[in-house]
Amino acid sequence: MEKYLIVGLGNPGSNYAKTRHNVGFMVINEICNKLNLSLDSSKFNGIFTKTIYNNSIVFFCQPTTYMNLSGEFVIKMLNFYNIPIKNLIVIYDDVDTKLGTIKLRKKGSSGGQNGIKNIINILKTDEIKRIRIGIDKDPHIKLDQYVLSNFKIDELVIIKPAIIKGALATLAAIGEDFDKVMNKFN
């Protein structure tokens, strides 16, 4: 059976739980709720669950380091469980994408997002499948303050369907051709 590492990016702790920067965690939580799983294992500064999905062994994970150190967790999980980079999918927030829009890519730069930037640097490749959840940006608020702020009530109505769609796209990508999944969800 093929193995997959699905990593949602965010910052640990209840004070960050509802922030824009934590939509990757929110997607992992949505998947766990949908599949009746819990993140009940911990290793390498991260929490995860292991399950069988679509004839594949899948690890759904949340690093418990801060966002900009996510790569350490990712490389340790890939190496320890012998998971190929081609079966890594990273889910994270994107300030350059409209709120509530999801975008799937097979490779590319970090776009300034520090979590994926750290993963790219540590893995020494930008050929990493990713699901970006649009959180927009506010020109009146400094970027670091904006991404660490909670969604406003009117934004939750927009972001919740994107989190669900991100979860569905993630599940669709397991054991499937990523190009087909991109065509369906982009």
From Swiss-Prot:
<feature type="binding site">
    <location>
        <position position="66"/>
    </location>
    <ligand>
        <name>tRNA</name>
    </ligand>
</feature>
<dbReference type="InterPro" id="IPR001328">
    <property type="entry name" value="Pept_tRNA_hydro"/>
</dbReference>
<dbReference type="Pfam" id="PF01195">
    <property type="entry name" value="Pept_tRNA_hydro"/>
</dbReference>
<dbReference type="GO" id="GO:0004045">
    <property type="term" value="F:peptidyl-tRNA hydrolase activity"/>
</dbReference>
<keyword id="KW-0378">Hydrolase</keyword>
<dbReference type="GO" id="GO:0072344">
    <property type="term" value="P:rescue of stalled ribosome"/>
</dbReference>
<dbReference type="InterPro" id="IPR036416">
    <property type="entry name" value="Pept_tRNA_hydro_sf"/>
</dbReference>
<comment type="function">
    <text>Hydrolyzes ribosome-free peptidyl-tRNAs (with 1 or more amino acids incorporated), which drop off the ribosome during protein synthesis, or as a result of ribosome stalling.</text>
</comment>
<keyword id="KW-0694">RNA-binding</keyword>
<feature type="binding site">
    <location>
        <position position="16"/>
    </location>
    <ligand>
        <name>tRNA</name>
    </ligand>
</feature>
<feature type="site" description="Stabilizes the basic form of H active site to accept a proton">
    <location>
        <position position="93"/>
    </location>
</feature>
<comment type="function">
    <text>Catalyzes the release of premature peptidyl moieties from peptidyl-tRNA molecules trapped in stalled 50S ribosomal subunits, and thus maintains levels of free tRNAs and 50S ribosomes.</text>
</comment>
<dbReference type="GO" id="GO:0005737">
    <property type="term" value="C:cytoplasm"/>
</dbReference>
<protein>
    <recommendedName>
        <fullName>Peptidyl-tRNA hydrolase</fullName>
        <ecNumber>3.1.1.29</ecNumber>
    </recommendedName>
</protein>
<keyword id="KW-0820">tRNA-binding</keyword>
<comment type="similarity">
    <text>Belongs to the PTH family.</text>
</comment>
<comment type="subunit">
    <text>Monomer.</text>
</comment>
<feature type="binding site">
    <location>
        <position position="68"/>
    </location>
    <ligand>
        <name>tRNA</name>
    </ligand>
</feature>
<dbReference type="GO" id="GO:0000049">
    <property type="term" value="F:tRNA binding"/>
</dbReference>
<feature type="active site" description="Proton acceptor">
    <location>
        <position position="21"/>
    </location>
</feature>
<dbReference type="GO" id="GO:0006515">
    <property type="term" value="P:protein quality control for misfolded or incompletely synthesized proteins"/>
</dbReference>
<dbReference type="InterPro" id="IPR018171">
    <property type="entry name" value="Pept_tRNA_hydro_CS"/>
</dbReference>
<feature type="site" description="Discriminates between blocked and unblocked aminoacyl-tRNA">
    <location>
        <position position="11"/>
    </location>
</feature>
<feature type="binding site">
    <location>
        <position position="114"/>
    </location>
    <ligand>
        <name>tRNA</name>
    </ligand>
</feature>
<keyword id="KW-0963">Cytoplasm</keyword>
